[in-house]
């Protein structure tokens, strides 16, 4: 069963140093914040230096056929979003559909940032879109 809130993030602009994403958030439990038109009015600007490379583990494994195979695992690293915001490398402009905030920042935007950094570490490329639905 769903709690009825979430958000979506879409990449708009990318240059050599930064990426600008726009996001929308919604809360189906409150008529004022439903955002039925899915208007992307919040922005998240991320400096590319914020994207941390994952820790890579390589291991030789013996396969059932008897051959050995190199297995590569990408282990995501923790990202300090609050430190990035303090240094100005991560800038969040809240959506008009913000109903819950943490220190003046939309909670959905923070969840989307976490998913954004995690997707980068898993795939190795800057995500074009990500979403968070609870």
Spans of features found by a protein language model:
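A short, surface-exposed beta-strand/turn
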Residues: 30-63
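Acidic, low-complexity intrinsically disordered segments
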Residues: 50-134
């Amino acid at each position: 069963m769903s709690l009825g809130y979430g958000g979506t993030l879409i990449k708009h602009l990318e240059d050599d140093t930064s990426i600008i994403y726009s996001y929308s958030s919604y809360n189906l439990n409150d008529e004022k914040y439903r955002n039925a038109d899915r208007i992307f009015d919040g922005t998240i600007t991320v400096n590319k230096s914020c994207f941390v490379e994952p820790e890579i583990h390589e291991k030789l494994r013996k396969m059932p056929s008897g051959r050995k195979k190199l297995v590569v695992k990408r282990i995501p690293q923790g990202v300090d979003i609050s430190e990035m915001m303090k240094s100005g490398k991560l800038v969040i402009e809240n959506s008009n559909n913000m109903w819950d905030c943490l220190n003046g920042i939309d909670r959905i935007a923070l969840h989307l940032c976490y998913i954004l950094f995690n997707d980068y570490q898993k795939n190795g490329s800057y995500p074009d879109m990500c979403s968070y639905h609870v």
